[in-house]
Each structure stands twice: as C-alpha cells, then as structure tokens.
Amino acid sequence: MNNFISVKDVTNIDTLVQKALSYKAAPFRDKNLGTNKRIGCLFLNPSMRTRLSTQIAAQNLGMEPIVFNVGNEGWMLEFEEEAIMSGSTVEHVKDAAPIFGKYFDILAIRTFPSLKNREDDYSELFIKQFIKYAGIPVVSLESATLHPLQSFTDIITISECLTNQPQPSTNKRPKIVLTWAPHVKPLPQCVANSFAQWINAWGKAEFVITHPEDYELDEEFTKGATITHNQEEALKDADFVYVKNWSTYNDYGKIYTNNPRWMLNNKRLELTNNAKVMHCLPVRRNVELSDEILDGPNSIVTQQAGNRVWAAQAVLSEILQRNS
C-alpha cells in the first residue's frame, strides 16, 4: 500500500481487518516501526475522532504526528493548475506540497466538499494535487466524496460483532442496511459513498440502501446493493443498521425532505433481527437517531469510534512497511 484514498488501495480487506484487530489486542507490538518518522496531519475542516485516532495510531507505531490546521494556521491554498493568483489564495499546492514532502514521511489530509458544484467536488482535485506534488504516501482523513478510514473501521466493527456472536447453522450472510436519516443541514455523501463502496468490495453481506426518493447516491459506489425507498421493508431481518444523513446527489447538495419518520427508533428496530446500530458520529440526537437507540443495548457507535485507532494503525503500518 502506497496511498490510502479508497478501498481500491487495499489488496485484501479481511487481512487488513485482522491486522487492525491484532493491534487492538497489542497496541505497541510494532512500537519501533515508525521510529524517526513523521506524519503530517493536514486539516482543511474540523475533526475530532479522525484527528485524535490518527495521532494515537501514529504514536503507537513510534511516529511523531504533527497537526496543521491549514485554513486557520496557514496560507489559503490554490489548487487549480495555471491559476492567476490575484484573488484570496496565497500559496499554490505545487509549492506547498513538495515542502510537506520534505518535512514528513507520510501526509494525511482531510478535505471537505463545497456541496455547490458536483463536478468540482467529485473530481477530488484537492487530494489528487497533494498526491501529485508531495512525493510521499498520502492518507485520506476524509475527502470530498469518500471517508475510507471510517469505512474500514466499520468493516472492522462488523467483523468483530460477527466473530463474537453465535454463528447460524446455515451459511446465511448478514444483512446490512444503510438508511438515510434527517438532518438540520445538507451533509456530504462521503460516508455513505464510502460505506457502500467498502461493503460491496467486501462481498460478505446482503446489502440494502434505503432513502427517500431523490436521495440516490452515485451508482459508482452503490452498484451491487439493493436500493429501496421503503425503510420498513429494508429493515426487516437486518443484522446491522447504519444510520447516516446525506444531501441530494443529482440536484447536488440539497435538502428535499426532513421527514422525522426516517429517524430510527425502537419501534422500527423491532423489524430487524435485533440489529446492531451504527453511526459515524457526531450525531444529532433525536433528529438522526433517538435517545432510546443511542443509549440502548443495540448501539455500537462507541465501539465503532474506538476502533478508529486500530484502523488508522493498520493502514499506517502497511505504508511504513511498504516504504521501509
């Protein structure tokens, strides 16, 4: 693994999952792997779990993490080629990225979509320009369209739950449902896109996506999933329910509905096979998910968030070993 931008950078998902779980069991077993190595963590938008878990993962491997809040602490960057920089941008990524390449051994970057121009966001210009000019491995801490560390964490958590529960006598695959939820503002499709991409690539589940009409995601990521606008039908016999809001893709970045009927509660959960409930966090309580779900025995959101460390540690370990 040289870069980590999407599931396409992973040769074998299950092998990487086992590596992450081995770090969970023994966090410091490779504490010298990153000795005398630095990772630069660049944030172009806010972060809590991603920021902290990546720093902890790097330190567990002996690396020195350095966090730089680009928007607040540095110059405004220009990403367009041949730009005439007579506006608000001060430094071009062509000049900044090679410097990061001199300072660090790995560059981890978190960007965010504008939700104004779909073509611009889905071109992934920001992260592609860093890959092009930095000259060192790049890890996505979330991009305009994907959140691979979150989705890898989700697979780890699902695998962990499946290992710890009694196995059915049949070889029935678990049913995983990704359900849209209401929100007070339009959110990116990153987490939903990425989760769909990883579950489909993993290939070990019956995968259903449910959302209101007009909230279809990009088919590039959902191909292979069953898609329905009937949430109750989707939830029947589900083993895992992943709750997430996203804004519209076709009429880009819009909110068409905030119907509270789409918020998961205990009554809806009764339709499932006592499903585990997942969310990437942060979550708007009693908007996206009810208190009774989040505080109940079926919620595994804290387990998910805890596993962010081991996901990041497995990825950084792979990159360090590849480039040692």
Question: How would you describe each model-predicted region?
Answer:
Residues M1-L52, I56:
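Positively charged, low-complexity intrinsically disordered leader regions
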Residues G34-G40, S47-S159, R284:
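Phosphate/diphosphate ligand-binding glycine-rich loop within oxidoreductases
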Residues L44-I66, S159-V243:
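Glycine-rich phosphate/diphosphate-binding loop of Rossmann-like nucleotide-binding domains
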Residues A134-I136, G203-A205, E270-K276:
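A short helix->loop->beta-strand "cap" motif at the edges of active sites that frequently abuts
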Residues E220-S299:
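Rossmann-like adenosine-cofactor binding region
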Residues D295-S324:
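C-terminal helix-to-coil terminal segments
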